[in-house]
């Protein structure tokens, strides 16, 4: 059986599991927490949006160009993508299964290198990072085949 990693993720947590045989239980081998994604918007930015006055004397609030939470989720997705590429290049896995919160799954897909995307043999848009390994296993194909 190919070396298989199962990545379970959201914008705050990533858990990586492996399996010994195609039908065996999951074994957690790595975990990451991105605490910045837990912060409130006001804690992520140094300044509040400003205000401008128009000719009529009324003011208008200026909006931030980017959403701080989305920015942090994107940073985390890039970090995980780089980690997955380095691990693949070090022959730590040969095929990858991904279960991720829908928005984070989209961010992660956009960050993954083409050679890593080719190794993805299963993905599911579901947020189950807080579930037990046994419960996560139930969301995967019963028999993990070689990609």
Each language-model region and where it sits:
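Terminal alpha-helical anchor/extension segments at protein ends
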Residues: 1-147
